[in-house]
Amino acid sequence: MENQDRAMRYARQIARMIQVDTVRRPGADKENFDRLHAVMAELFPRVFEGCRRWEFESSLLFCWPGKTRRALVLMSHQDVVEAPGAWKYPPFSGTIAEGKLWGRGALDVKGNLHDIFQAVEELMEAGYTPEWDVYIAASHEEETGGNTLIVDFLREQGIVPEMLVDEGSSIQPCPVPGFDGHAAMVSVAEKGYIDVKCVARGPGGHASIPGKGTPLPRLGAFMCEVENTDLFPVRLSSASAEMYRRMAALSADEGERAYLTAIAEERPGWQESLGERQKEMLGTTIAFTMAGGSQAANVIPQEAYVICN
């Protein structure tokens, strides 16, 4: 019962953070971030009063002093992405229903942000002093590319972290067949990221005489070809191989154990045996996310583009 009460208290606290709309809208959202900071100061008074604190625009950095000047950085972010489409419960309601907490940011990543602050709050309440300085970095522009203000400050202060802990994977029930329990999927590596603008040019004109080979259809054909072609081979990093080895050791299913071991050891045919989600995790993904053409429905553009993430 005590654990259930505590879980519900945490859920209500996260709900309050979700109820503050922190979608990043340049030049128009500082008031919302200030509201979130006020909620957090109420929820985590020891952190806000007992730690050194810096504010960079709406990004926050705290330092919980330790016994040595070695540094651990716990990273998260306050902003969330837009919430379009139909939602079962309003995205900024923080509704607790059906045994779940609903809302934009519940997973990405106000739950994580809350948990970092809550852990430090409870440790401070218990009188604990960390071995290292613990920095809590909570940015406000992660979803839109981010700034480097916190990094610049740490560099200027000569602070070189011994360890960075960022948002990672989840705790999953039964990650492999034959395993009875939950597994924390700890992320120890991260893929790079790039946005590419792909442009097609051609003769424009009026939609009444469209012609052939105009920019938008060519871009459509290009996107279909990219989507249906394996442009980048799947490679197994040392971290990924170790993950598959450990998952194999956990499985009580002999066939699943052999399958996971074959991947870990890169035996012949291992790449062909991967499912789509595994390929996405291990390989380079390509997603077309934005597009642009003419500004009128009856005008064929001379130039059109798509953004490839």
Go through each PLM region and give its residues.
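Acidic-enriched catalytic cores of C-N bond-cleaving enzymes acting on peptides and small amides
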Residues: 155-157, 162, 170-181, 186-195, ...
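A generic structural motif
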Residues: 24, 107, 202-208, 295
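Predominant activation on well-ordered alpha-helical scaffold segments within soluble catalytic domains
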Residues: 15, 41, 114-117, 121, ...
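Acidic/histidine-rich catalytic neighborhood of metal-dependent amide-processing enzymes
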Residues: 101, 107-185
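Acidic/His- and Gly-rich active-site-bordering loop/insert found
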Residues: 1-106, 125-132
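Structural signal for hydrophobic packing residues in well-ordered secondary-structure cores
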Residues: 18, 40, 44-48, 124, ...
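Glycine-rich, aromatic-lined ligand/substrate-binding cores of catalytic
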Residues: 299-308
